[in-house]
Amino acid sequence: MVVAVTHLDHRSTGARVRQVEAILRWYEQSYKGDPFILLGDFNEPPEGPVYRALVESGLKDTWRLLGFEDDSQSYTHHDFEGQADVGRIDWIFVSDHFQVLNGNIVLDSRDGRYPSDHFPYYVDLAFNR
């Protein structure tokens, strides 16, 4: 099983596309056929070219597999005070080896304070039989 965590460039769409192409090429050349989880801060909402490249590679967006939509409540980035600013830019993609059992974005804070400008997104996975 391969688990890769990434944090793509926050300024350039072209750089993000090249980064995700490099990740996919690395997986294909070194681990093709192995169960694969790719997650992290992709610095782009799901309407962009990075998302399309991941979907076209055959990886599955766990958010979509859970039946969730991208709407005003589905954001992972905020202004440190819990106010959404750019949407769902943190993703978890999986290969067909996995079943997504559960998941969500955690919006909780402690005394109105947040340890990051990203809300955690988690999924519970099981191997397909």
Residue ranges: model-predicted function:
Residues T6, L39-D41:
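Active-site flanking residues adjacent to catalytic metal/cofactor-binding acidic residues
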